[in-house]
A protein has these predicted regions:
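Catalytic Zn2+-binding segment of zinc metalloproteases
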Residues: 72-82, 578-583
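His/Glu-based metal-binding/catalytic segments typifying zinc-dependent metallopeptidases
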Residues: 42-45, 52-54, 161, 165, ...
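M16 family metallopeptidases and their MPP-like homologs
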Residues: 47-58, 84-132, 139-147, 173-198, ...
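Hydrophobic, small-residue-rich alpha-helical packing segments that form membrane-like cores
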Residues: 146-220, 224-242, 246-273, 278-280, ...
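C-terminal regions of mature proteins
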Residues: 2-4, 227, 384-542, 669-767, ...
Length: 832
């Protein structure tokens, strides 16, 4: 279609604004429909098309109604009245992203695909689900909550109910929720938008439908569409099917600001207690309400302050809290939250005696005062801004570009400033640099104004309680007993009949889908050249990278003994947290931030195609600007060869940081831990993965005492010598500039010749006729189960059938059994 001009009307949508978006090589168009709906197109040549519907959803209680609607709107609609069109569609889609998410004050539905027909299918099904959902009682009971008469007093089931039994009881989630609830007590942020299990069971089907009517009107909807799209086709579809006869409605107002908050408040919350937990397992966090989240400069300012103060243990505030000795680590919730109307800044301790809460507050405030007095430092600021420029320049593929744009745009758009107000990052970086040039103490002044002199703050203590889960279960059981009546069994039979009734094949056939003929037949090869540089194998790929070099150093560790292998996860963490030669840990941290857009160290292992020969690899992944390549590679060689890995103080910091990450992730990633543990008895590669990142690794870390640090440091230095041998190295590199190859030759020349020992590590694998069950206790009312079976070799033709079987289980019979009927919150069949 011809490019529209401001004032043009297409399908009752009037074009209100056109904006060039140089950062995305795009043009932006903002349309407003007569019904009040706004649509923003970000048009460019990107074939990965993306869309996202956004509704302002303001909770008024802890029932999680917005979360339940997020699940259930996608479970049957006027055009597609099947049980689960979302999953049925996924069976024949090549989407690169498909999801829905509930935030504290909004709900987002989003998807992307590189195929135009697939994109159209996704948009078609999503639009019908959102504007014409069936909202059946059975869907509410399946996705939300239902009472089951089990003959033992009754119990509750439902997908969201079960999900929140896990996540709402997570210690760190209680910390973050406690801060928001206490800072904004008379607003929607005082409630849990995801739902609290105790309150979820109070939600009725009628209240659920009422919430939909109040929050899903067209005037309360914003739609972002990104990529190489047909604007007229999309606008015509929306108007013809859903908006043509819709009355004009205004968007719901932005959440009101709190007026009843108490200055310098102190609150205390309880959380589940782990078996064997101690009094010092509490969290104490200080949280502030700062500036509105609808201004890009304010968001970038606070984001940069978080990076400067808390990015790693060498940063001044992070270091000050660790040096205080009050706790094992800082709280993982430390940082900023920009998803509320006012941004919040949180910082505090985890693993602290709650009786020391006042002392914790004094340490935090005194540390901030000292930082402002001494200054953050020009080098730190320049390094942080350079990293921000790198991220803005980089072409990433980890998430769709449309999702990145949405995450920026939504701040200003939802507060009435339009979709472009907070969409671009480059102009805001320019503005921030100008502000710093005008005021060399720009960040210190912000801290003094918005933190030290700001009494809209709260000190939150979260204390583990061994009765927490018991009392929660007791209250839920009491509510179940009180709600049971003579009609409950009949309600259960009605629900089961609905679940047992298969979708009519003729109705299923109405769902749009892809055929094999819709898929491109051409396979784009991942082309690279195999070379040798400084006697090291090099996999070289030359392509446009926007002026960035990418280098992966792969170090063969297949011959490492178990004593050398187990410490590698800690080694990886310690490498970037310690000093090197005349550089202390802070100087190393700043050099990494200044020279590299990314510097990651990971360990992995893999079998050959038949699953027989195990190879372990220690990877160093680097990304840097081409103009910095010589300095970056020289520094990388210096760090890998000369990092001070025997420093007991840095070992303590790295160990605490790593243990904190394990403890924080165990509930959220419990299914992954279970799968990894169960898989570890089948192949050497899986057993190595368990050693490095599973329960075996956790037990090894938990067993390290402070008296072990000296011996551990010696072991780390021995590992360093083993790793840094040229005979172990393989390099992968990608750049638009062939001069990188010469730079790599100089880089590799720093490494001494040498090769492997013959030892290796033992493996204990399951015999073909053997079965094994293992159970671990968690502080949760939710169970996480993984079952792993032996399969044919990768080269066996049965693997093709097995791949298809995994997809069928994930979207078919097994999904229906455990999710649709059983109310499980997750099911992830797959093969390795």
């Amino acid at each position: 279609m011809d490019q529209p001009a401001v004032g043009d009307c297409i399908a009752h949508f009037t074009l209100q604004e056109v904006r060039p978006l140089a950062e995305y090589q795009a043009v932006g168009y903002r349309f407003v429909h007569a019904s009040g709906m706004e649509v923003c197109f970000v048009e460019n040549g990107d074939n990965e098309q993306f869309f996202s519907f956004v509704f302002r959803t303001l909770p008024e209680d802890d029932t999680g109604v917005a979360h339940i609607l997020e699940h259930s709107t996608l479970s049957g609609s006027r055009r597609y009245p099947v049980h689960d069109p979302f999953i049925t569609l996924d069976k024949s889609s090549v989407n690169t992203y498909m999801n829905a998410m509930t935030y504290p004050d909004k709900t987002i539905y989003l998807a992307s695909s590189p195929l135009p027909k697939d994109f159209d299918n996704l948009l078609d099904v999503y639009a019908d689900a959102l504007f014409a959902p069936l909202l059946r009682r059975e869907t509410f009971e399946q996705e939300g909550v239902r009472l089951v008469d089990d003959g033992k007093g009754g119990h509750w089931e439902g997908v969201v109910f079960n999900e929140m039994l896990g996540s709402a009881n997570d210690h760190d989630s209680i910390v973050a929720r406690g801060v928001s609830r206490s800072l904004f007590p008379d607003t929607c942020y005082a409630y849990e938008s995801g739902g609290n299990p105790i309150s979820i069971v109070d939600l009725s089907w009628e209240r659920y439908k009422e919430f939909y009517r109040n929050h899903y009107a067209s005037g309360n909807c914003r739609l972002l569409v990104y990529g190489n799209n047909d604007m007229r086709k999309i606008l015509d579809m929306l108007d013809a099917r859903y908006l043509h006869d819709a009355p004009h409605t205004e968007p719901l107002p932005a959440p009101r600001r709190s007026t009843t908050w108490k200055p310098d408040a102190r609150v205390r919350f309880l959380a589940p207690k782990e078996a064997g937990g101690k009094r010092g397992d509490a969290s104490v966090v200080l949280g502030w309400a700062t500036e509105p989240a609808d201004d890009s400069l304010s968001i970038l300012t606070l984001n940069t302050i978080v990076d400067l103060l808390l990015d790693d243990p060498s940063c001044p505030l992070y270091k000050a809290l660790l040096d205080s000795g009050l706790a094992e680590d800082i709280s993982p919730e430390s940082g900023m939250i920009a998803d509320l109307r006012d941004m919040t800044f949180l910082v505090g301790f985890k693993g602290i005696d709650p009786a020391r809460a006042d002392e914790a507050e004094r340490v935090i405030l005194a540390s901030l005062e000292q930082i402002c007095q001494e200054g953050i430092g020009r080098e730190a600021i320049e390094s942080s801004l350079k990293r921000a420029r790198f991220k803005q320049q980089e072409i990433t593929g980890s998430v769709p570009m449309g999702l990145r744009i949405l995450s920026r745009s939504v701040h200003g758009w939802m507060d009435g400033k339009g979709p472009f107000a907070t969409m671009e990052t480059a102009p805001v970086l320019d503005l921030l640099e100008k502000e710093i040039a005008k005021d060399c103490r720009y960040f210190e002044h912000w801290i003094e104004k918005h933190l030290l002199a700001n009494h809209h703050r709260v000190l939150v203590s979260v204390v583990p309680d061994e009765r927490y889960l018991v009392e929660q279960k007791h209250e839920l059981d009491e509510k179940a007993r009180a709600a049971l009546n003579e009609g409950t069994k009949e309600e259960n039979r009605r629900f089961q009949a609905f679940e047992d009734t298969a979708d009519d094949p003729r109705v299923l056939a109405t769902l749009p889908h892809l055929a094999l003929s819709d898929l491109p037949l051409e396979i784009v090869p991942d082309a690279y050249d195999e070379r040798s540089v400084a006697a090291v194998p090099l996999w070289w790929r030359k392509q446009f990278t926007c002026g960035i070099d990418y280098v992966t150093l792969a170090i063969d560790i297949s011959d490492f003994t178990e004593e050398e292998y187990l410490p590698l996860t800690l080694y990886s963490r310690l490498l970037t947290m310690t000093g090197c030669g005349d550089l202390d840990s802070r100087a190393v941290s700043l050099a990494i931030k200044r020279l590299f857009g990314g510097f990651n160290v990971v360990t992995d292992s893999a079998s050959d195609m038949r699953g027989r020969t195990n190879r372990g690899w220690f990877f160093v992944q680097m990304g840097f600007l081409s103009q910095d390549r010589d300095e970056a590679l020289d520094f990388a060689a210096r760090l890998l060869l000369g990092a001070d890995l025997a420093d007991p103080a840095r070992i303590k910091v790295a160990l605490g940081d790593l243990k904190g990450d394990f403890a924080d992730s165990i509930n959220y990633n419990a299914t992954l831990f279970a799968s990894q543990c169960a898989s570890s008895v089948f192949t050497e590669a899986a057993q190595d993965a368990e050693r490095l990142g599973g329960i075996v690794q956790w037990n090894w870390l938990a067993g390290i005492k402070e008296s072990d640090y000296a011996a551990l440091g010696k072991r780390m230095l021995g590992i360093q010598k083993l790793l840094c041998q040229r005979g172990r190295l393989v390099v992968g590199a990608t750049s638009g500039d062939g001069a990188l190859v010469d730079a790599l030759s100089r880089f590799l020349g720093h490494f001494p010749a040498g090769r492997s020992q013959e030892a290796g590590r033992p493996f204990t694998l399951l015999r073909p006729d053997e079965h094994l069950k293992r159970t671990f206790a968690l502080p949760s009312n939710v169970a996480y189960v993984s079952q792993v079976c032996r399969t044919p070799e990768t080269t066996d033709r049965l693997q093709v059938a097995q791949t298809l079987l995994s997809q069928m289980l994930a979207t078919g019979w097994l999904w229906n059994l455990v999710r649709m009927r059983g109310g499980l919150m997750a099911l992830t069949p797959g093969r390795t």
